[in-house]
Amino acid sequence: MKDDKIVLYMHAGSGNHGCEAIVNSLCRMLPKPAILMTNRPKEDETYSLKELCSNFVQEKSIEKNVFVHTWYYLKRKLLHDPDCFMEYRYQDICGKNLHRLNISIGGDNYCYDNMLDRLISANRMFHRQGAKTVLYGCSIEPELLKRPEIMEDMKRYDAIVARESLTFAALQEAGIDKNIHLYPDSAFLLETKLAPLPEGWVPGKMLGLNISPMIVDNEKTPGITM
């Protein structure tokens, strides 16, 4: 098992500036160089992460290869191996390439149902192979913690860092009270860059809203957000 670098995984790409900000600020705080597992390396290079991560490792796409997809589907069904898909996707950071510490980029990943299986599988896979995992900078809906598979997943992490008090309190109330920490989103530690204010700006009378592209993408009425 390798101990020279720390792996960051479950990164949704730098086009999602929330993820980019967490990785950017986290890389500046870590005591060792970070390897970033990503499915959008060119996007990450375009934004702020190129000089901060020691290298990018591209996640393997199992869906693009019919033979590979069929083989791993049969392996999962016949051998009852729920994590074999993740072992293929993450082959460059698991198995013989395993690192001791792996940090899951939290953000609001646990707020999306289509992410949950991968989050659980990756955490379980790393632990089965003897590595440690940290869920960093996360927000989790309290209702989600009523699901047994999510509770099992939370208990598997070696440490959890919640980025706001609602998640921290919900974890404690659910019985996850060991090695959990409350710390503001590390994006607040990013270097400040002053920009010219728009015409009509009135100090103390303005309200700024940071609109996620995901909100726009999921509009039920096109254009209603903006």
Question: Could you tell me what each predicted segment is?
Answer:
Residues 1-226:
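Active-site anion-handling motifs in enzyme catalytic cores
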